[in-house]
């Protein structure tokens, strides 16, 4: 968090209250307001962080109470699946939550959902921000791990 203060336009991954507490503390000290998206773990995946679909509305409202955090919407990453109906249902759940939030919060401008492999479906379901790193820059190259 200490490296983000004053250097970001939008934090896409506000995924827990402990992070919000630390962000609030540092942003207040720097007289800065952090624009953030609430991260939602729409597939309930153990390998991803974020609030569950059931927690998202209450978490968003609680985050709005931090004076130096301005909530701007929601962010989610779809699970990897060949079941397009399942993925569409997750996207539509996110859209419903976003619509509720947008009606209550004039700052809620973004539904960030969709990456290089699934952005078309996400846009069809209402996403207005996509992340296309792999399409633009190629697949990530991870260092080879050795046991020695």
Spell out what each predicted region is.
Residues 1-117, 125, 137:
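Conserved alpha/beta-domain cores
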